[in-house]
A protein has these predicted regions:
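Generic detection of short hydrophobic beta-strand segments and adjacent strand-loop junctions
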Residues: 17-21, 66
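Short hydrophobic/aromatic-rich motifs at helix boundaries and adjacent loops
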Residues: 6-9, 21-22, 58-60, 116-117
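Generic "edge-of-domain/loop-turn" microfeature
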Residues: 15-17, 26-28, 109, 141
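A conserved, hydrophobic alpha-helical segment in the catalytic core
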Residues: 20-57
Length: 207
């Protein structure tokens, strides 16, 4: 598994196939192989199935990458404890230094009740020294800061980006000399992504 893709071996109809999945994360492997199994069961030929998987790219905000000089700003949407936990597990397996930015909103599309953040398994991510800086933002940034503090972050400071200042977020993400991983809830992602795309280049929504 790499940050931006995985190469897996899948047995389809008894044949061993090496397949590239163009999105990082173990859960995206599960999704791809689940789709392959379903399509194969419906009688779609292996070549068509494999070709479809290898030419698929994620939608905006889902493991999306923006280049910032020699570094990358990564946007990973989360919507519930399961997806958030899988994202933390993915980040735990990154060896290079990075900046982590968590963004929590409580708009209707996010869910008004944010107690679900206490069900997130952070997978011991803050035990790793390569998580160099931690920022939180969004309408409920202080709630996220409390959640992260209770998880335990060692001697790191949890820094707040107030007022949903996404230009400041981009400034921070691009000025650290390392990759940044931004983990927002849905409406936060929808608000910040146009700012990131305008500053760093990227397709408009739905393209």
């Amino acid at each position: 598994m790499k940050n931006d893709h995985s190469v897996v071996v899948a047995n389809l109809n008894g044949d061993r196939n090496i397949i590239r999945v163009n999105i990082g994360g173990a859960y995206n492997i599960y999704n791809a192989i689940g789709c392959a199994a379903a399509l194969t069961a419906f009688g779609i030929d292996e070549k068509t199935v494999i070709d479809a998987i290898e030419h698929f790219n994620g939608a905006f905000g889902r493991m999306e990458h923006f280049k910032a000089g020699d570094n990358t700003v990564n946007l990973i949407l989360v919507k519930n404890p399961a997806g958030f936990s899988q994202t933390m597990n993915f980040l735990k397996n990154i060896d290079d230094d990075f900046t982590l930015i968590l963004s929590l909103n409580d708009n209707a599309a996010d869910g008004r009740d944010i107690s679900w953040i206490w069900d997130v398994d952070f997978a011991g991510i803050f035990e790793k020294a390569n998580v160099k800086e931690i920022y939180v933002t969004g309408k409920r940034c202080y709630d996220m800061a409390v959640r992260v503090k209770y998880e335990g972050v060692g001697n790191r400071e949890i820094k707040i980006i107030e007022n949903e200042d996404y230009n400041k977020l981009v400034d921070i993400a691009t000025s650290q000399g390392r990759d940044a991983y931004i983990v927002p809830t849905y409406t936060s992602m929808m608000a910040m992504r146009p700012v990131i795309a305008k500053r760093l280049g990227g397709k408009d929504f739905w393209e």
